[in-house]
UniProtKB/Swiss-Prot annotation:
One of its GO terms (molecular function) is unfolded protein binding. Residues 164-206 have a biased composition (Basic and acidic residues). Residues 134-215 are annotated as: Disordered. One of its GO terms (cellular component) is cytoplasm. Belongs to the UreE family. It comes from Rhodopseudomonas palustris (strain HaA2). Keywords: Chaperone, Cytoplasm, Nickel, Nickel insertion. GO terms for biological process: protein folding; protein-containing complex assembly; urea metabolic process. This is Urease accessory protein UreE. SUPFAM superfamilies: Urease metallochaperone UreE, C-terminal domain, Urease metallochaperone UreE, N-terminal domain. Involved in urease metallocenter assembly. Binds nickel. Probably functions as a nickel donor during metallocenter assembly. The gene is ureE. Gene3D superfamilies: Urease metallochaperone UreE, N-terminal domain (2.60.260.20), UreE, C-terminal domain (3.30.70.790). Pfam families: UreE_C, UreE_N. The keyword Cytoplasm applies.
């Protein structure tokens, strides 16, 4: 089977594509995977490291032909605030839960999650269910690949994470903050941690409860 072992960055290519692959967020985070294009061309994605592909990238086959990557629509939540300051506050809460987030001009997009939707609405924001391609921000320290702001994951493979479901059983993080006269008793800082499935390339074992007593 012919291989695709290189990636041309987002729209940094001019040649016509021999075929197209339509991939969701999970399948755009692969190192090695057999694929078939929409026109029937089968090939093996065989990259040196797991790479975050984006819509508009091109996979380079061994014979020089290109396969265009198209981001598939998937179930998302579009989050809006009352004003820019409120939207930034909502973004902080999403970041506190380590959720992949796509930043729009006046909105945020995350993978659909009913727990997070309820949280956003409880904070006064809007959370609307949509179907759209998902192109979240990459890591702040991620190197680029060939003209685009893509990252690879060094010597270890980060497969996709399922952020659609949150397991509240095994990840009990009871963060109790005692800051002098500041009483945080009414605030439950529960972190909705994502489930790491079989595609995660590293062990995230959290078998203990984290309690932080800041005096």
């Amino acid at each position: 089977m012919i291989r695709a072992s290189k990636v041309h960055g987002q729209y940094h290519w001019k040649e016509p594509a021999a075929d197209t692959v339509v991939l969701d967020f999970d399948d755009r985070h692969r190192r090695r995977m057999a694929m078939t294009g929409t026109r029937g061309l089968s090939f093996l994605l065989d990259l040196e490291h797991a790479t975050a592909l984006r819509g508009g990238d091109a996979l380079v086959l061994d014979d020089g032909r290109l396969i265009e990557v198209v981001a598939a629509p998937e179930p998302l939540l579009e989050i809006r605030g009352r004003d820019p300051q409120h939207l930034v506050r909502l973004a902080w809460h999403l970041g506190n839960r380590h959720l992949p987030t796509q930043i729009m001009a006046k909105a945020l997009r995350i993978r659909r999650d009913h727990v997070i939707a309820d949280m956003v609405r409880g904070l006064g924001g809007k959370a609307v269910e949509i179907e759209a391609p998902f192109d979240p921000e990459g890591g702040a320290y991620a190197p680029a690949h060939e003209g685009a702001a893509h990252h690879d994951h060094g010597g270890h493979e980060h497969r996709h994470h399922d952020h659609g479901h949150h397991d509240h059983a095994d990840h009990e993080h009871d963060h109790k903050h005692d800051h002098g006269k500041h009483d945080h008793a009414g605030h439950d800082h529960a972190h909705d941690h994502h489930v790491h499935d079989e595609h995660c390339g590293h062990d995230h074992g959290h078998g203990h409860s984290h309690k932080h007593d800041h005096k």
